[in-house]
Amino acid sequence: MSLTQLLTSAPFTGPKNPDAVLADIPKSLKKLGRLARRYVPLVKPEATEEIAIAHDYLTQRGGAERVVLAMHRAFPDAPIYTTLYDPEGTFPEFKDAKIITSPLNKIGYLRRNHRMALPILPFASSFMKVPAERTVVSTTGWAHGFNFAGRKFIYCHSPARWLYLSDQYLGEKSTGPVPLLLKTLRPALMLWDHWAAHRSAVYVANASVIKKRIENVYGKKDVPIFFPPHSVD
C-alpha cells in the first residue's frame, strides 16, 4: 500500500471528551491538567472545508516535508495549515498549494530559525484553527495540537524531541535564553503535548523506533508503522 492509498483510506477519528483526555495524561500532570480544564475553554472552529492538511512548519527540505508533499498529492485541493512557511527553504512544489500560516510567519527571523520560537510554538499552534471536517496531520510536536473542527488522522514522525530529547534536539544551542525558558515551561508544555496527543485515538508511526517512542511517551500501544517516501518524485 502506498502512502497515498493509506491516506485516502485513513481511519479519521474525532476528538475525545476532555474528561477522558484528563484521565489518560500522566499522574504528574493531572493537577495542572485539572486547572487547564477548568480555566482554559476549548472553542472549536466551525467546519467549512471537507478536508485539510496540517504540518508543524514548512521551512526546510526533509523527510517530514516529503510526507506533506505526498499528502498534497493525495488531496491536491486541500489547504495546508502550518505555523511557518519559507518558500525558499522548503520544496518548491509547495508553491502550488494553498498554505495558511500562523501570525508568527510574519516574523522573517523565525521562518529562518524556527527553534528560536520553541517555547511559544505550542501556544501559537493552539490558536491555529483548522476548519475542516477531516484533517491529515504530519507532526513532530506541534501540528497535532492545532485546533481542529472535525476528525483527524495523525502521522507521527516523533513525539516532540524539543521536549523529551531537548539537549539532543538543540545541539550546540542547548544553552542560552531559549533553552532556559523551555526548561522553565516544561511542565506546561508537557501537559499541552499530552493533551494534544490523547485527543486523537489513532496514531501512525513512521518507523519502529518511533512506534516505541510513542508508546513510552504517550502510552499508546499497537501503533501501526508506515514508512515515509524517500523522494519527492
Task: Set out the residue ranges of the language-model regions.
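Glycosyltransferases and closely related glycan-assembly transferases
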Residues: V43-P45, R73, S125-R134, G141-H157, ...
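Nucleotide-activated donor-dependent transferases that construct or modify glycoconjugates
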Residues: P45-T59, T83-L84
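Short amphipathic alpha-helix
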Residues: A64-A74
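Active-site donor-binding segments of glycosyltransferases and PAPS-dependent sulfotransferases
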Residues: A74-W142
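Active-site proximal beta-strand in glycosyltransferases
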Residues: R134-V137, N147-G176, P224
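Helix N-cap/beta->alpha junction signal
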Residues: T139-T140, S158, A207-S208
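Membrane-proximal helix-turn-helix segments that form the acceptor-binding/catalytic region
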Residues: G171-Y203, K211
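Helix-loop-beta element that forms the nucleotide-linked donor phosphate-binding surface
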Residues: V204-N206, I210-H230
